[in-house]
Amino acid sequence: MTIVERARVFATAAHAAVGQVRKYTFEPYIVHPTEVAGIVATVPHTDVMVAAAYLHDTVEDTGVSIVDIQKEFGNEVAALVSWLTDVSRPEDGNRAVRKARDREHIAMAPAAAQTVKLADLIANSRSIMAHDPAFAKIYLEEKRMLLEVLTRGDATLMARARSIVGE
């Protein structure tokens, strides 16, 4: 199996093991990482980036650690997943404070991580706009602030993201 196939299988199992489903649609959670990986694959990318796209929520949402990712997929994938993992915790403060901390973290990330983050933003924004228009107003403002720091991400995805969030 390729690293991308291994990442897809691993992420599918990790999210299923905790019973995670997509908010609003209740589909198996892997639908989201699959969409993110598919978006990454539409622009210049590496297999490491696509693997990280599949794995980007495993550390935040499942029992998987960065060490587990490193052991299974190596340092490059683990580094990208680490950049893509939110660093804020509930005790850091309200949502605005937490999102600011997470923006500061991803602002320092390399181009590959920021490209995956743009794909994640595109996928999540479309879903939230379709299923929760009231929350979308708050969410899209947060994403507009996030776009300000994703300066190293892929330009094509940046343009798509800006179009979606209404910038």
Region spans (language model):
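Active-site helical microenvironments for divalent-metal-assisted chemistry
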Residues: 1-167
